[in-house]
Amino acid sequence: LWLFHSPANFIKTFCHSAVNGALLFIQLCQPLFEVIMNKNKLKALALPVLKNAVSLRLRIEKALARRRKMAEYNPALEHDLNIVIHNKQLNTIPKKVWMFWAGTLVPVEIQSFVNKVARENPAWTVNVVNDSNLSQYLPELTFTRQDLLVAHRSDVIRLELLYKYGGVWMDASIILNQPLDAFLAVNEDNRYDMIAFYREVSTVDQRYPVIETWFMAVPEKNHFIENWLRYFKPIIEEGAAAMFNRLQQLPNYKEIAQKITNPQYLILNITQQQALREYNQYNFYLRKCEANAIYYQRLVSWDAVQLSRMIMVDKLPEVLPPIIKLTGLDRKYLSTNLKYGVINKDSLLGEVLFADVPQKQPDTSIAEMPGRAPVTLK
């Protein structure tokens, strides 16, 4: 009788129930796909299925108008470490940004992040270093080991570039929401050896803070970088496994490692601790990354699906953190979210992507990146 008297309402209710049923099915299947992915033989098959399932789920939620608003950045959560040991006036931090991207293809979101930095910091030169142009900047640096991870090669490169030229090292996966001059304004009297971030949960002893390596601002020929490089550069010859085994044999290894997660991968952080313990007479201004650059990851306990929804679907807050650091995990569902039209133009990632790169543009080579002066992309 209801169908006969109100066919429009019946169809609307039926469609709504069908969509909710599909959404529930995808949510129930998602843990199964993740379990399957833990089996290496099935990972290649399961990963595309999982990505499509998650993106379809987000697309359905978007269709049902289930949008939220991202949490506001809360400066009250900040706990800066202003460490001043000496009264020396150091060299000015040069207006140079350094990034590294291995290979020749750059994902569309990385193109947009780089362009955003250049566009909003016109007085700075943004240099994207890659395997092809590395010799232009560091002609004496060579890598002979085939088993050295890209991450560890990048670690050597960032220290070498910062020591030789100074400036700001930024991972290419950073979304910069504040002009660099404003972010570095604390250094107006050139007193700091480094301006960077520290990870509070990894730091046991605040005399030796665990400094994050994805954003570091230093003057050229900085003694701290030189000392750090001396401890880390042997990885080129030793390899990561042998070097980590050697570090583990140190009598003070537990003190050095503090609570660094995955130390066999984060050897750069371990050697940073070595350098600090040898000579700790540096001035640092360190921001708490949990309250700033990885604020949103912490809010969702590093859940990739929740974070995808937050940065690609949800509305922007009134105030964003000055810097947002994204990882491969955070961008895990980006390609399928683009495919299904999940990303909203007024979301965090949408605002950056749609600023200068069409949504469906494929990954392009470094030489084809749509950089704007003064970006250096050779």
Sequence positions of predicted segments:
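Glycosyltransferase-associated regions of secretory-pathway enzymes
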Residues: M37-S154, A172-K378
